[in-house]
Regions:
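Short loop/edge segments at beta-strand edges and connector loops
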Residues: 72-73, 88, 147, 189, ...
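Short, active-site-adjacent cap segments at secondary-structure transitions
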Residues: 77-78, 119, 151-153, 193-195, ...
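A short, gly/pro- and small-residue-rich
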Residues: 56-72, 84-93, 205-211, 226-230, ...
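Short, well-ordered alpha-helix to beta-strand connector turns
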Residues: 31-32, 43-44, 67, 81-82, ...
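Acidic, Mg2+-coordinating active-site environments of NTP-dependent enzymes
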Residues: 78-80, 179-180, 206-367, 443-447, ...
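ATP-dependent carboxylate-amine ligase
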Residues: 1-19, 43-46, 52, 263, ...
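N-terminal leader/targeting and accessory segments in enzymes
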Residues: 1-96, 100, 313, 317, ...
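Phosphate-binding loop of NTP-binding sites
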Residues: 93-246, 250-262, 326, 332, ...
């Protein structure tokens, strides 16, 4: 069903977002398309003017392609009169428009949102694996997913360009999920999506908060840790049940914020020494993981809850993945999924670019490709590798992105330097910042802890060198890009063969 232009104007007015408007008699115009991409065909379309780099040429192109009205924060003088609605905040306006245009498909979905500094993607796939096992058994379609790797909504299956899409894309994917017969969807919710209103208006059945650590702090992201943390916590304003990791740093504050939700479920392993209040004094998680063991690339652990006490196995290495699995089990528990489907789903799932392990038995060499790219993920990964490969030397290959998250250069340099026998610094989306500047920043911290390093800008060459120079009984960690297929160099997103392809080529 399509709605008239006046319907969208009224919704924006009700949200107190309208500054002024001039519709030139078009208030009864039926709107059939909604987009912010001027390249799209938009017959009878409503065009959104957004972004610091927006140009009036985009608006001209939009009307050439069929737009009948534009919405933006400022008036653009064209050579001819066109209807417009000016709003106070275009980011707040976009989800209002999208929700109406796509008729709020979230109401017809069991919607799970996941936030946290690390583990969002893996947890998303763990939840999907469990739900798919169960839904297949009762004749339902598989769960939709919106992740930093891909979007699968039952109609579209595409590689993701950002962790959480803009609101109009988000609502379109949910509409696709409903129209294709899906009943559930899991999605990653980034701090940027929360801060910039991309998920505004959504009501999550479950909001999962995995963990928190300093990240994404730069002029183009978050001003400071408080801004970052507050953005993450805001997910609780729009979820029915909060799902909380009691092992996380700042768990006391996370629990306090979770009171905004109607109910709370907790998970963890009892590692609560950093938590204040009743948790530190003995609160047991609702979903309690214990007896964690690693064996031949698999992680075994037990989970105790109000309904079961069972043994689980993860098909992926990485002891830190137990926390992600516990989050997925907690979500499944809320949906009353029988435990046998939880066990089956977690046992078989693997996630692209996450703890992908390649072994040369001839050289007794292991290479692990992982997306770890911030302090928390580096700490967890290096500690896990030491536990799983106690007699091996560690060599690491990584870099940091240009012009953002500057704290990573210090954090990753120090952590990798402390754990590695040698570090190879290479390009990881340098953008418009010089690689020599980025690698120089990181190298200072690697060197400060006495670790040798080498700077090799070409990532494929760096991976090759690390593998060729690694001694027997070594673990080479190739970190930061996971399964990403593009490298941002200058203003261009260049095709990149993936870290895994280079590893398989040179191992």
């Amino acid at each position: 069903m399509h709605y008239m232009l006046k319907t969208y104007l009224k919704l924006l007015q009700q949200a107190n977002l309208v500054k002024s408007c001039c519709l030139y008699g078009k208030k009864d115009q039926i709107i059939e398309n909604l987009t912010f991409d001027s390249r799209e065909t938009m017959k009878r379309g409503l065009f959104i003017c957004k972004g610091a780099a927006f140009k009036i040429d985009y608006l001209r192109q939009a009307f050439k392609n069929g737009a009948v009205c534009y919405i933006g924060e400022e008036h653009f003088p064209l050579d001819y009169e066109v209807p417009y609605i000016l709003v106070k905040d275009i980011r707040k306006a976009m989800p209002v428009l999208a929700k109406q245009f796509y008729e709020d498909p979230s109401r017809e979905l069991d919607l799970v949102g996941i936030t946290g500094t690390k583990g969002k993607t893996t947890t998303s796939y763990y939840i999907k694996a469990i739900m798919d096992e169960y839904q297949k058994s009762i004749g339902l379609r598989s769960m939709g997913i919106i992740s930093s790797i891909e979007v699968k909504d039952g109609v579209e299956h595409k590689t993701s360009s950002m962790t959480t899409p803009e609101s109009m894309e988000l609502y379109r994917h949910m509409k696709n999920a409903v129209s294709s017969g899906k009943h559930s969807m899991v999605m990653e919710v980034s701090s940027q999506a929360l801060k910039y209103q991309r998920v505004r208006g959504l009501n999550f059945d479950v909001g999962v908060f995995l963990n928190i650590s300093e990240d994404h702090i730069s002029p183009s992201e978050h001003d400071d840790f408080e801004d970052y943390f507050s953005a993450k916590l805001s997910i609780f304003r729009q979820c029915q049940t909060a799902c909380i990791n009691l092992d996380s740093d700042k768990a006391d504050r996370i629990l306090q914020a979770s009171r905004l939700a109607k109910s709370v479920i907790t998970f963890g392993t009892g590692q609560a020494d950093r938590i204040d209040g009743d948790v530190k004094n003995g609160r047991i998680p609702d979903i309690f993981g214990y007896d964690i063991q690693q064996e031949k690339g698999r992680i075994n652990f037990r989970v105790k809850s109000g309904r079961f006490d069972e043994r689980f196995t993860l098909g992926m290495p990485g002891v830190f993945n137990v926390e992600n699995a516990l989050a997925a089990i907690a979500v499944a528990y809320l949906y009353h999924i029988p435990v046998e489907y939880m066990i089956a789903g977690l046992k078989k799932v693997k996630v692209k670019g996450r703890m992908e392990q390649y072994v040369s038995h001839k050289r007794r060499l292991t290479v692990i490709v992982d997306y770890a790219h911030n302090r928390l993920s580096f700490e967890k990964l290096f500690q896990s590798v030491l536990m799983e490969h106690p007699f091996s030397k560690i060599v690491s290959v990584f870099g940091c992105p240009g012009n953002k998250a500057y704290n990573r250069r210090r954090d990753l340099g120090l952590i990798a330097g402390l754990y590695s026998k040698k570090v190879y610094l290479s390009a990881d989306d340098p953008g418009e910042e010089q690689f020599t500047h980025i690698s120089g920043d990181i190298a200072r911290y690697v060197e400060s802890v006495g670790c040798p390093y080498e700077c090799i800008e070409n990532r494929g060459d760096a991976i090759k060198r690390a593998i060729e120079e690694a001694e027997e009984e070594s673990v080479v960690l190739v970190l930061g890009k996971g399964c990403e297929t593009h490298q941002k160099i200058g203003k261009v997103s260049c095709a990149y063969p993936t870290d895994a392809n280079f590893v398989k080529k040179y191992l």
